[in-house]
């Protein structure tokens, strides 16, 4: 792996140039398109249930996904140092290769019923996904100005959701008249082709951070060119930040409902109905991130005020949704050990089930934005963003790993719902507490803190410090309450 990383750094394939391409917003758009092609399409497959295969294969999917997200966790945590060593361009290109390979593994399983190769491809995707997600999170945080954080995050998630919607429409169109429980070969082929395009996007359009300019004209500082060992030590130091540790439970919980919802969709509905559910689940997420952004980035309100308002609304919706879904499971006596009702959209009872499924889509999309927005309160240092991004995505993957592990263990739908009620309550509470404490603060590290032991930089360019000094915050900070060895504005 070390040799591969070193060789990739030496590759000098030219990328597309131009002022537009080098803007932070365009770079975030390209990162979003990569999410469209890879995780977006992958989540469409996951939403079909059982990893896109036959519903009786859900145990194989749970085992594979547990391994995938376990490796995703480890590689996500290490993603920051690897990202800073490779640079975003090659980190994204390498990370994108895991998704088409994994879909190929699912295709192989659907045709042969043999699990070995599928489990291997799941393991490879876990490694690749940790790198891809750390890179996209870094871009959303480092290439945006102080008042654009949630906008950049929302752009990534909305375009990813569009990818999942396109994938779901493809599957829905093919499955509309299908009576089979499996996924047709055409779905796999189309998905693999779309995912492979992400590798080309990364190679052709992603620029070095030293070449990227934010919308206010300042430089998106290039991560420092420390040794890999120094970067790992920096990761360890970041992991000791108690503020970040307080938000990691929120990261853990934010997407942990994925296996529960996927299995419910696979178990309770017919193939064409769960394909329709999948379409609508992602369509609603076109709107959720940007509606949430209108609150979190509202210039008329102070940052802490708008954060508390937005996160309180989110908490009420999430808790009400989970309460409703638990009530639905109890009232319908839904038990995974019973025969599937195979509910079709033409049958009575579908409307209420669909509403609950869509509300869980609101939880899913809003949680992505809210956790990253809370993490953006902690710092404006690109070095820290790279490390925070890896720790955040790795911990989020750990929650998804546990989610698939719980499902694979045969825990009842009701039992899983209670677990996720607790998880998401902790998420909402920790976000509100951290926003109330740190909502007014933005870490503007001094030149001394960021550059003391850094003598060389990516592309040999000494980053400008004007990014730290020129970003404006919406709030005034009571400097008397802050430690004297740090600079805040």
From Swiss-Prot:
Keyword entries, A-Z: Membrane, Transmembrane, Transmembrane helix
Subcellular location: Membrane
Record-linked CDD domains: MFS_unc93-like
MF annotations from Gene Ontology: transmembrane transporter activity
Keyword Membrane among record annotations: yes
Regions that span the bilayer: 29-49, 67-87, 90-110, 119-139, 152-172, 186-206, 276-296, 308-328, 351-371, 397-417, 418-438
Matching Gene3D superfamilies: MFS general substrate transporter like domains
Coiled coil: none
GO cellular-component term (any): membrane
Source domain of life: Eukaryota
Gene Ontology BP terms: transmembrane transport
Principal cellular location given in the protein's record: membrane
Membrane topology: Multi-pass membrane protein
Database matches in PANTHER family: ET TRANSLATION PRODUCT-RELATED, UNC93-LIKE PROTEIN C922.05C
Protein name: Uncharacterized membrane protein C6F6.04c
The species this protein was found in: Schizosaccharomyces pombe (strain 972 / ATCC 24843)
